[in-house]
């Protein structure tokens, strides 16, 4: 029992026990030599040294070295030395193996500072990593820590290495084509994987979230997301209560997939949380992309780190104080007296798209959704550009290629900025069609309602059995009753059959349909399949329906806009090769927005307004 307790305490305790036992045996044998006078040199120190040297060397003395008792006692010491050496080697080997296993399991503590922590391992993880690595290309080495228990650390490491190698290969090919310098991701970003439950304090502290820059909660399930937010918020609150002066606290960025869980998430995270409502984000992009061809590409480019990016810049960083510029009439004008629109004409490497005053309000109001904190505030976007003066703004939202210092000239740019002319938008009266029902349907209809003319007809096409099941839900019926600005017509139709779709679209009253939105089939899935397989099946159905619509578009309706919701980038690329429709990959959009907000918290407001 004593030995069991000692072994449970680890390698150090076992080595100490072995050392004490060996010393005791050496002293015991030396005392026998002294007591019986078996050694020629009866000095106690000499006897102890003889026993110790014999034990260490494990060398049995010969008969010529002393008396028979001396040879016998030192022979026992040599045997004890053999046992000591063997057991010591075994203990050290076991300790090293245990430590290596700990490292393999990803339980080692992270010692980095100002890093990003991603909690959760799924398909979106790689999209987030790609965005972070892209954003780090013009920065010094940054660290990303990924924590989850979905698979072993070694497997996560292998997948990350493979992913980075594939991305670098693709980027190198594009760089050669454009004659640009290729920079591998690994030169600016290191990724550390850790194994553990994302909601456990010990695992979170192992990732050193106390000293990280931001935390991205990347769980598929809303309940799990709220648990992780609560755990992270607890650690951040402990840091706040510790009262360390000058300590910049991390914050949490998360996505909620069901709008009903927004309040719970916000209350769990408090002022340390920036939460994105996935249905609202995706439905807004889907609905607006259906208005004009190519708009989805604009959204995608705006949200990700490729090309020009949106930066949140303090006015002091632009060094406007006391600066004067030459106006169109030749007079000198103080730069603080310019409007934001006028200021843009003196910027050489950036474009201001908005501005704000004061600090962003992160206060939590119980019963209100996270994004509502901006409802009563003046817009920070372009509509205020001609009315808002530079002196009335503390921060700018700037669109530029890299986060280099913004250059202000005394004279206007040679390429003049054309004034944005607001056009009176006249809502069309032509009907729209939505192919398939999904978790986004109600929210998409609400977004369409905001810009379609009153009583515009919207057809919702779905297979009879699925449509009946969907409309039988009382909550769905309650939400449908709230949609009053457009007329909904539910059409039971075999949308997976080309002939059925063609027959419907070829009817004279249906040829006026202006746009078709294909929603991902994520409501009626095979529960026996994994989530990844379910998404693959949904994308396959989307591509099949797209091909049918594309043929109908070519034969009957050349002006038809088609917008598709996809789950995977690979499937989007496959569909893009044969058509020029608008594609929105939900996981990519969510990953891009989460990453941008995790890097600069204040960007959440402008993304909400966009």
Spans of features found by a protein language model:
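Cytosolic regulatory regions of ion transport systems
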Residues: 1-610
């Amino acid at each position: 029992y004593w030995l069991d307790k000692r072994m449970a305490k680890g390698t150090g305790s076992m080595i100490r026990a072995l050392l004490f036992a060996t010393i005791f045996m050496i002293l015991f044998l030396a005392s026998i030599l002294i007591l019986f006078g078996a050694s020629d040199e009866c000095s106690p120190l000499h006897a102890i040294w003889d026993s110790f040297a014999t034990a260490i060397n494990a060398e049995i003395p010969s008969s010529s070295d002393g008396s028979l008792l001396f040879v016998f006692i030192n022979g026992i010491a040599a045997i004890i030395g053999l046992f000591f050496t063997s057991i010591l080697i075994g203990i050290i080997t076991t300790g090293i193996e245990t430590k290596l296993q700990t490292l393999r399991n990803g339980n080692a503590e992270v010692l980095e500072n100002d890093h990003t922590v991603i909690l959760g391992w799924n398909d979106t993880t790689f999209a987030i990593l790609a965005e972070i690595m892209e954003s780090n290309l013009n920065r010094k080495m940054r660290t990303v820590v990924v924590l989850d228990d979905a698979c072993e650390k070694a497997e996560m490491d292998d997948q990350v290495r493979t992913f980075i190698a594939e991305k670098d290969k693709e980027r190198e090919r594009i760089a050669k084509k454009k004659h640009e310098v290729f920079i591998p991701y690994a030169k600016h970003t290191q990724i550390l994987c850790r194994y553990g439950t994302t909601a456990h304090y010990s695992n979170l502290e192992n990732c050193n979230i106390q000293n990280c820059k931001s935390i991205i909660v990347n769980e598929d399930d809303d309940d799990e997301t709220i648990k992780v937010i609560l755990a992270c918020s607890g650690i951040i609150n402990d840091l706040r209560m510790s009262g360390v002066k000058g300590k910049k606290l991390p914050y949490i960025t998360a996505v909620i997939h069901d709008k009903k869980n927004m309040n719970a998430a916000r209350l769990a995270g408090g002022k340390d949380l920036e939460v994105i409502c996935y249905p609202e984000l995706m439905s807004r992009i889907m609905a607006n992309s259906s208005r004009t061809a190519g708009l989805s590409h604009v959204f995608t480019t705006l949200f990700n780190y490729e090309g020009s990016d949106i930066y949140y810049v303090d006015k002091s960083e632009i060094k406007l104080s006391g600066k004067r510029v030459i106006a169109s009439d030749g007079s000198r004008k103080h730069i603080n007296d310019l409007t934001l629109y006028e200021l843009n004409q003196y910027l050489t490497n950036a474009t201001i798209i908005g501005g704000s005053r004061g600090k962003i309000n992160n206060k939590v109001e119980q019963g209100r959704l996270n994004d509502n904190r901006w409802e009563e505030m003046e817009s920070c976007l372009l509509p205020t550009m001609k009315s808002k003066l530079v002196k009335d703004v503390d921060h700018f939202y700037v669109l530029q290629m890299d986060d280099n210092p913004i250059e202000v000239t005394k004279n206007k740019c040679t390429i003049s900025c054309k004034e944005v002319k607001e056009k009176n938008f006249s809502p069309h009266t032509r009907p729209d069609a939505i192919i398939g029902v999904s978790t986004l349907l109600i929210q998409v209809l609400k977004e369409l309602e905001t810009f379609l003319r009153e009583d515009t007809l919207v057809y919702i096409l779905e297979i009879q059995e699925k449509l009946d099941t969907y409309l039988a839900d009382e909550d769905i019926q309650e939400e449908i009753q709230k949609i009053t600005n457009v007329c909904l017509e539910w059409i039971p139709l075999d949308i997976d059959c080309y002939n059925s779709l063609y027959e419907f679209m070829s009817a004279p009253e249906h040829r006026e349909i202006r746009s078709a939105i294909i929603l991902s089939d994520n409501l009626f899935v095979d529960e026996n399949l994994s989530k990844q397989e379910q998404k693959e099946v949904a994308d396959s159905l989307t591509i099949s329906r797209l091909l049918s619509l594309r043929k109908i578009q070519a034969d009957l309706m050349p002006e038809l806009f088609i917008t598709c919701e996809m789950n995977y980038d690979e499937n989007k690329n496959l569909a893009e090769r044969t058509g020029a429709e608008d594609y929105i990959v939900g996981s990519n959009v969510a990953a891009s927005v989460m990453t941008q907000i995790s890097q600069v918290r204040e960007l959440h407001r402008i993304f909400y307004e966009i």
